[in-house]
Amino acid sequence: MERKKSVFNWSGGKDSAHALWRAMQSDEYEIVALLTTANRSTRRSTMHGIPESLLLAQAERIGVPLHVVDLAPQGGMEDYGEAMTRAVGHFRQQGVTHFIFGDIFLHDVRSYREAQLAPLGIEVVEPLWGRSSAEVMRDFLESGLRTVVVTTCLLYTSPSPRDPKT
């Protein structure tokens, strides 16, 4: 059976790594590239804020080339759509027929992707789709994959009103 030429949409996060691992374990898909979006000014991924240099190191370690789609810092959905359409066209010329994602349950995101990609001849694949977060985490840990926290998000700039130290 000929494997389906596929691009994996890479965020650099644990769910993305787990979905990629599952897709690579399958004889169904030939992963020809990891695709990520990055802020043109900061050179960080738009999804998790991971430095592009780290994403490149991840791709090198995985053994699949990274394709970075540059996005304007203040660009909206129209800019994103245009940039992704160009990227899809590039991969369609190489015979890619499937885009693989690591989503679990975001129906609106999946619907958007399917609506955008189907007219371009790309089928959406979601190896983790419909599984509970607990099940995905358990499978991730059992897979032998490991994760390292490389970015965090500051949610509060002042002590919480519940902070016992204040």
Q: Which residues are covered by each model-predicted region?
A:
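ATP-dependent adenylation/nucleotidyltransferase module used to activate substrates
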Residues: 1-149
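A short, aromatic/hydrophobic, helix- or strand-capping loop or linear motif
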Residues: 151-154
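Conserved small/polar residues in nucleotide/adenosyl-binding loops
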Residues: 156-161
